[in-house]
Amino acid sequence: MYDITKWKHMFKLDPAKSISDENLEALCMSNTDAIIIGGTDDVTEDNVIHLMSRVRRYPLPLVLEVSNVESVMPGFDFYFIPTVMNSKDTKYHNEILLEALKKYGHVINFDEVFFEGYVVLNANSKVAKITKAYTQLGIEDVEAYAQMAEELYRFPIMYVEYSGTYGDVDKVKAIANMLQHTQLFYGGGITNIDKANEMSNIADTIVVGDIIYNDIKKALKTVKIKESNK
């Protein structure tokens, strides 16, 4: 069994986006700790299973981040279930989880399932608009969400999502300082090794996504943070 708490770097692949076999191999053989498959929209059973079968050729952990019940399937090492804590829509708190449990609860291995407490902080992102996330949060707000995630909900993971833009370092630091047991994931705007280094010194784990599709060489360089975080 893989130990998620030791992961420092992950690549996130969107099943709705195309990626060449060459680039996929480069990602999977790059020494990243894991591949996450997940997206905000146009995530279907067909495109998830297609991408999963391609990644499965390589010997590294594979995670499905569940965004709808229809795309859930066996074959992943772990399943991450996001709950958007700053969403105004209860669908993104627990309704998707409820539907998943009704359909698959009798066959789920709960050792493979991890709840993620998401805080979405880029107001202009697609995920913020779809989830109706309230993003105008100050330091005290994000500290309270961190406390909520760790002390009350006892989430194993808190995910700070800036989705497409680089985050406010002070806010991410404030969240990190509140967490002792909950693992902090950071995703958003990591487009080069300098940003990867900066965020990897704050968060436990960084998630690199969009840059994969814009500049694969820059994406691959972000894995170098593991050398300085040994």
Curated annotation (Swiss-Prot):
CDD domains: PcrB_like. It catalyses: sn-glycerol 1-phosphate + all-trans-heptaprenyl diphosphate = 3-heptaprenyl-sn-glycero-1-phosphate + diphosphate. Keywords: Lipid biosynthesis, Lipid metabolism, Magnesium, Metal-binding, Phospholipid biosynthesis, Phospholipid metabolism, Transferase. GO terms for molecular function: heptaprenylglyceryl phosphate synthase activity; magnesium ion binding. Pathway: Membrane lipid metabolism; glycerophospholipid metabolism. Sn-glycerol 1-phosphate binds at residues 12, 159-164, 189, 209-210. InterPro entries: GGGP/HepGP_synthase_I (IPR039074), GGGP/HepGP_synthase_sf (IPR038597), GGGP_HepGP_synthase (IPR008205). This is Heptaprenylglyceryl phosphate synthase. It comes from Staphylococcus epidermidis (strain ATCC 35984 / DSM 28319 / BCRC 17069 / CCUG 31568 / BM 3577 / RP62A).
